[in-house]
Amino acid sequence: MKKIEAIIKPFKLDEVKEALHEIGLQGITVTEAKGFGRQKGHTELYRGAEYVVDFLPKVKIELVIEDALVERAIEAIQQAAQTGRIGDGKIFVYAIEEAIRIRTGERGGDAI
């Protein structure tokens, strides 16, 4: 099992969710996040004063899937989230030792 964590632009969430659904993946966790990478931040004018906004709004998507689906999931996320501009995000893949469904006690692939 692998955990895929993707940090994407918020307006791309629906496209990514639909792309994952099209390849048969349904269970995802979504968290609002803030961060910056190479694009750094930007400046905004508020009531005549200039402010530096270091952290930009992002969305973090997490899903745990069987190893056989990892490449398809990565491709789906990458294609749906890509704008070709700085700040499109990142995808991280982690190994998962165990998954347990709390309600039933199912383990491993049955739990996801």
Swiss-Prot record:
InterPro entries: N-reg_PII, N-reg_PII-like_a/b, N-reg_PII/ATP_PRibTrfase_C, N-reg_PII_CS, N-reg_PII_urydylation_site. The modification O-UMP-tyrosine is found at Y51. One of its GO terms (biological process) is nitrogen fixation. GO terms for molecular function: ATP binding; enzyme regulator activity. PROSITE patterns: PII_GLNB_CTER (PS00638), PII_GLNB_DOM (PS51343), PII_GLNB_UMP (PS00496). GO terms for cellular component: cytosol. Keywords: Nitrogen fixation, Nucleotide-binding, Phosphoprotein, Transcription, Transcription regulation. Homotrimer. P-II indirectly controls the transcription of the glutamine synthetase gene (glnA). P-II prevents NR-II-catalyzed conversion of NR-I to NR-I-phosphate, the transcriptional activator of glnA. When P-II is uridylylated to P-II-UMP, these events are reversed. When the ratio of Gln to 2-ketoglutarate decreases, P-II is uridylylated to P-II-UMP, which causes the deadenylation of glutamine synthetase, so activating the enzyme. Belongs to the P(II) protein family. This is Nitrogen regulatory protein P-II. It comes from Rhodospirillum rubrum (strain ATCC 11170 / ATH 1.1.1 / DSM 467 / LMG 4362 / NCIMB 8255 / S1). The lineage of its organism: Bacteria, Pseudomonadati, Pseudomonadota, Alphaproteobacteria, Rhodospirillales.
